[in-house]
Structure formats: structure tokens, C-alpha cells
Regions:
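A structural signal for short beta-strand/turn segments enriched in small hydrophobics and glycine
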Residues: 237-239, 295-307
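Asparagine-centered strand-capping/turn motif at beta-strand->loop junctions
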Residues: 54-61
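Intrinsically disordered, low-complexity Pro/Gly/Ser/Thr-rich segments with frequent PxxP/GP/PP motifs
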Residues: 76-121
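Zn2+-dependent peptidoglycan hydrolase active-site motif and core
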Residues: 238-286
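Short glycine/threonine/proline-enriched tight-turn/helix- or strand-capping micro-motif at secondary-structure
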Residues: 179-233, 242-263
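Acidic, glycine-rich catalytic/binding loops that coordinate metals and/or anionic ligands
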Residues: 152-171, 179-182, 212, 257-261, ...
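Short, solvent-exposed loop/turn segments enriched in Ser/Thr/Gly
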Residues: 34, 44-51
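Short histidine-centered loop motifs in beta-beta connectors
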Residues: 232, 274, 278-301
């Protein structure tokens, strides 16, 4: 049995040696992935975003001590509290993050949410991984799954869905409390992450010298600057799903206007097929404002509806994402980039809370083309 010290040495030279010595008692851990990652340019940096599922097929307990990933010449090592914050045990959603999340009990599974920042480098064709686990006796083991093939598809480039000054709320990130990033749901016997690259768009203005997203009673939808703003089609395509007439929520109320179910979480919405297996979803629209019906063709810049607060929504905003199925929740989220805009920040702000936002020094606006904004970036679309 390899000692922990020997395994550490092996771990450091993992990618320079073809294989570890045979383990007489290999951990019965199966490693799979929710989907093949595809590169995305976020705030000027190439990133790979994906999820590793580890299932323990034995009765033994293991602690996930470290995960190493290699994509081309870029190498990443995750361990300790950082790895704990990236790891969730199935059945423990919403529980406090901590070391216990790295424990893989017999017959249980964990998901490790990975985000590899490659900087200016191009994405490699494969990602190699090594997992370091420790058994109940304190012995260390290495698990080396087959290389993960990276998708060679480029992100879809689309036009802006809005005009003016906006905050890109909860765009793809790896925080433990990232709502979109952790929204793994099962439908049809398959685990999906449709909202992997979703963004909640909230408009801001400067009021009395303070940047804020609202002014007036916080329990009124029309107090929020984004409310009733037009939503523009980001691409040419065909409407394949829509809903209108669902009532609006009272902002930050203790309950929704309707009982939230799988099929109404998007509220009033429009889904547009813009390419084979590529669907844009615009969610939470104001009732009575949806302009198209199923089967209609739309073109870039058409007004689809207006920003509202319907479905699973706590205050007015536009939720937008692109996935490979015509569904809000049952699909695989795919990367996309916007043709143009300017970006500053990001800011340290909870855009779902109706409070004035102290942005602090945010630097100058940076014009961009074909880019996806950083989490909570201030984005201007014209």
C-alpha cells in the first residue's frame, strides 16, 4: 500500500509519468462528467467549465484529498477548503460547505464543479485528471480516469438582449453559492445543467450619486429600473415554446404568485431555436408583453417581450441562457458570447437584494467583441 508521502511525490510527477504502479486495492470510484466542456472567452480569458461526478461503488469511505487537472500546458491542483467549496455530495444540496463535502461514503456520489482559467492560451483537445483519495485506514490512493475530450465547437456569438447599463448577475463562476452553476436537475432519467452559462440581467442607474438597481418601495415591481424594459432577440430563429399570462410576484415576498413547478419556473417566457440543438431562453417576462407565438420566426433585434418578475423570480430581471434542448431546466447549457459591448468591474454586489450598491472603484469601461461577461460585471449594450 502506497504511503501518503509516496503518493504526494507521485502526485507531483503525475503528468510526467504514464501510469502509477498497480494498486492492489484500487478504490471502487467511478468518475464521469455531466457533459463535455467547450471553451468560452469570459472577460478576455479562455475558460473550461464542467462537472465531475464521483460515485463510490464500495462500502468503504473515502475522503477526496485533491484533484489535479491538466489541459495542454496548463496544470491545476485543487485541495483543502478550495476543493471543499467546489464539491457537493448528492442529497446534501444547500448544506453548509466544508470538509465533510469531500467525504464519499459507500454507495454515495459527489459532484466536483470545475472551472479552469487558461488565460490567453487556447483550450487543449483533452483534459487529464488525477484524484487523490484517502481511505478509512489513512492510506492514500490515486484514481486516474480516462482523459476528458474537450468539445471543438466554438461558442455561439449572439447580439445583446438589452440596451443600456446592466449588471451581469451570477454569470458563470465557481462560488459555492452560485445559483446557476449548481442548478443540476434530473428529468427523463438524465441529470442536466441547463443554466451553466445563464445570466440574470439587472439594470442599474445613478441616483443621488449612488449606483442602484431600484428606487421606491422595494415591494413594487415598477421600483426596479429594469422592469418593463424591452427584451431583444439575440439571433434569428423560430419560436418553439412560449408562455404568457402568468401573474407577477411581489418582489422579495415570502411566497410566489403561483406554486412553482418544473414546467412553470421560467414564468412568462420565449424559447427560440437559433441553430440545430441550440435554443435561447428568455425568462420571467412581464405578463401580457410576449409578442410571438410558437411557430413564428424572429430576427435579430425583434422585441420579444418586456422584463418582468414571473415564475421562479424574486425581483424583476431577465434570465437568459442557451442550451441544447427547448427547456428551461432540462438541457445542457452551452457557451455563448456577445457581439459587442463594454464592460467594467466586476462589482461585489448581490444583485438579488434590493439595496443600493456601493460599487467602489470599478475602473474604465473596456470595449469588447465576442466575449462573455464576468460575474457581476457592469455591461453597457448599445
Amino acid at each position: 500500500m502506497a504511503s501518503a508521502r509516496l503518493l504526494t511525490l507521485c502526485f507531483l510527477v503525475f503528468f510526467t509519468t504514464p501510469l502509477f504502479a498497480s494498486d492492489p486495492h484500487p478504490p471502487q470510484l467511478n468518475v464521469s462528467f455531466l457533459a463535455r466542456p467547450a471553451p468560452i472567452v469570459q472577460d478576455g480569458s479562455t475558460r473550461l467549465v464542467y462537472e465531475m461526478v464521483i460515485t463510490n461503488f464500495s462500502n468503504n469511505k473515502y475522503v477526496l484529498d485533491a484533484v489535479e487537472a491538466k489541459a495542454g500546458t496548463a496544470q491545476f491542483t485543487f485541495g483543502g477548503s478550495a476543493l471543499a467549496g467546489m464539491t457537493v455530495r448528492l442529497g446534501a444540496w444547500g448544506q453548509p460547505e466544508g470538509a465533510a463535502d469531500r467525504t464519499i461514503d459507500g454507495g454515495r456520489s459527489v459532484i466536483v464543479f470545475l472551472l479552469l482559467d487558461l488565460g490567453n492560451s487556447k483550450a487543449a483537445s483533452t483534459i487529464e485528471h488525477m484524484l487523490q483519495v484517502v481511505d478509512e485506514k489513512g492510506d492514500a490512493h490515486a484514481v486516474v480516469p480516462a482523459p476528458l475530450v474537450v468539445s471543438n465547437e466554438n461558442p455561439i456569438v449572439v447580439s445583446p438582449p438589452l440596451r443600456g447599463d446592466w449588471i451581469a448577475g451570477d454569470s458563470v463562476n465557481n462560488r459555492p453559492d452560485a445559483a446557476h452553476r449548481r442548478a443540476v436537475l434530473v428529468d427523463g432519467g438524465h441529470a442536466w445543467l441547463a443554466q451553466r452559462y445563464a445570466i440574470d440581467w439587472v439594470q442599474y442607474q445613478t441616483v443621488d450619486g449612488v449606483r442602484t438597481t431600484w428606487k421606491g418601495p422595494e415591494d413594487r415591481n415598477d421600483s426596479y429600473f429594469c422592469y418593463n424594459q424591452p427584451i431583444y432577440s439575440v439571433a434569428t430563429g423560430k419560436v418553439v415554446d412560449m408562455a404568457d399570462g402568468l401573474p407577477e410576484n411581489v418582489p422579495h415576498s415570502a411566497k410566489y404568485a403561483i406554486a412553482i413547478e418544473f414546467n412553470n419556473a421560467a414564468g412568462n417566457h420565449v424559447v427560440v431555436e437559433i441553430a440545430p440543438n441550440r435554443y435561447v431562453l428568455y425568462a420571467h417576462m412581464r405578463p401580457g408583453t410576449v409578442q410571438f407565438k410558437v411557430g413564428d420566426m424572429v430576427k435579430v433585434g425583434d422585441i420579444l417581450g418586456h422584463v418582468g418578475n414571473t415564475g421562479s423570480s424574486t425581483e424583476p430581471h431577465l434570465h437568459m441562457h442557451i442550451d441544447d434542448q427547448p427547456s428551461f431546466l432540462a438541457g445542457n447549457g452551452v457557451p455563448y458570447e456577445f457581439t459587442q459591448g463594454s464592460e467594467s468591474g466586476p462589482v461585489n454586489a448581490n444583485v438579488s437584494s434590493p439595496t443600493a450598491i456601493s460599487f467602489g472603484p470599478i475602473g474604465p469601461q473596456r470595449p469588447f467583441t465576442n466575449d462573455y461577461p464576468a460575474e457581476n460585471a457592469l455591461v453597457t449594450f448599445k
